[in-house]
Amino acid sequence: MERNQRRTLVGRVVSDKMDKTITVIVETKRNHPVYGKRINYSKKYKAHDEKNIAKEGDIVRIMETRPLSATKHFRLVEVLEEAVII
């Protein structure tokens, strides 16, 4: 698979406590098959962050890659928006 054909997702970092690993929550909306109501779905992915640049609350883009560990199949592409620290 070429790099530009791999699946990319945009989500929010919910954990950066691991070394070179972040946990990203990706939220999507879908219609209920019977009732038609919009329902929010969310899924967590672990992603490889080589330089530890992403912090908790950041909006990031991750890309599918070869398995890096038992649970890590994505890598950080870029930080789209940094979290505001209050």
UniProtKB/Swiss-Prot annotation:
Give this protein's Gene Ontology molecular function annotations: rRNA binding; structural constituent of ribosome
Domain of life (superkingdom) = Bacteria
Q: Which UniProt keywords apply?
A: Ribonucleoprotein, Ribosomal protein, RNA-binding, rRNA-binding
Q: Which Pfam families match?
A: Ribosomal_S17
Q: Tell me a GO cellular component.
A: cytosolic small ribosomal subunit
GO biological process terms held by the UniProt record: translation
Supply the InterPro entries for this chain. Answer: NA-bd_OB-fold, Ribosomal_uS17, Ribosomal_uS17_bact/chlr, Ribosomal_uS17_CS
Query: What does the subunit section of this Swiss-Prot or TrEMBL entry state?
Result: Part of the 30S ribosomal subunit.
Q: What does this protein do?
A: One of the primary rRNA binding proteins, it binds specifically to the 5'-end of 16S ribosomal RNA.
Family named by the database record: Belongs to the universal ribosomal protein uS17 family.
* PANTHER family from the UniProt entry: 40S RIBOSOMAL PROTEIN S11 FAMILY MEMBER, SMALL RIBOSOMAL SUBUNIT PROTEIN US17M
Recorded protein name is Small ribosomal subunit protein uS17
> Could you tell me which species this protein originates from?
Streptococcus uberis (strain ATCC BAA-854 / 0140J)
